[in-house]
Amino acid sequence: MDHLEVYHQFEVSKPVSLQPHLNLLAKGLIGAEWLVAGSGLGATNHFEAGGFMRSRAGVEWPDVQIHFLPVALSYDGTTVAETRTGHSLQMHVGYNRSPSRGFVRASAPLPPVTSNGAGDLMTAPPPPPPVVRFNYMSDEEDWRGFRAAVRIAREIVAQPAFDGLIGPEVTPGAAAHTDAELDQFLVEHLESAYHPCGTCRMGAARDKMAVVDGGGRVHGVDGLRVVDASVFPTIPNGNLNAPTIMLAEKMADHILGRALPPDHAQAAATWIDPEWRTRQRERPPVRKQWDGEF
C-alpha cells in the first residue's frame, strides 16, 4: 500500500552540497538561472545517483532502494542537519519488499509478510471520511530488511570512492550498530515515501480482493474504469511514477482498442544473478563495516 524510507545523513567534507543554497536569496538566483537559461542547480531533481540491491542471499529480485540527495534535511525542507562544514548529504534508504506476493522469491520460503494495510468505506448518510490503516512495520521481516538496508548504505559510503568526501555520520550516528539501536533509530525516523497504491487492485473476477479487471474495468459496474496507481495488485519495489505511466499507456491502448505490435509481445530480458540463492553479491566490498549477518 505504501513505501517507507529513512534518511541516512552524513556531514560532507567538501563544498559540494546544496546546504549553503537554502536561503531565500540563493533560491531566487537558482530559479532565475533556470528560467532564463535552463541551467544550474534548478535544472536537476537532485536525485541523480541511486541503486537497487538485494538485502541478502536467497532474495531473487532487489528489495532495497537507495538514492542520494546532496543535502541532509527533512522531507518538508524545514529542518536541515547541523554540520561543522556547512555541507551535508543524505541517502534515502528504503526496504521495498512487496508484501505477501510478487517481486521477491526465495530458495527457502520467506516468512509471510503481514504488514498489510486496510481501508474502510462506510455508506451510512452522511458518509464519514474513509479510514486508512497502513499497519507499517507490523512484521519482523520489515525490521530485518530495514536494518540490512541501513548497513548496506554504510558499506557504500565506506568505499574508497568516498574518501575525502564523507565526514561523520549524523543519523543514525556512529554509535548505533546493534539491532536494538538501529530499531530505535527506525522507530524515531521512518516516514512515508508518499507512494500509496494498490487500494483498487487488479485481478480476476473470482478474486474477492480485486476491484478491476486487466483492462481497468470495475467488476460489476458498466462503463467505469480506474487507471491509476491504485490498481497495482502488488507494490512495485521502486518509485511509482514510471510504473504508473506504463500502466496508463497500456490502459489507453485497451480503451482505444489498439493491439500491441508483435515485437512487443515479450517482456524485456532482465538479468538475475545465477547464484542468487547462495550469495548476496559477486564480491566482498573493499571495506566492510559490518561483520554480522544482514
Across the structure, where does each feature detected by a protein language model lie?
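Mid-to-C-terminal "cap/lid" subdomains and adjacent gly/pro-rich loops that border
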Residues: 1-84, 155-161, 180, 184-197, ...
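Structured core elements
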Residues: 7-9, 52, 105, 120, ...
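Intrinsically disordered, low-complexity regions
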Residues: 29, 39-43, 51-52, 78, ...
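Glycine-rich, aromatic-lined ligand/substrate-binding cores of catalytic
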Residues: 43-132, 136-160
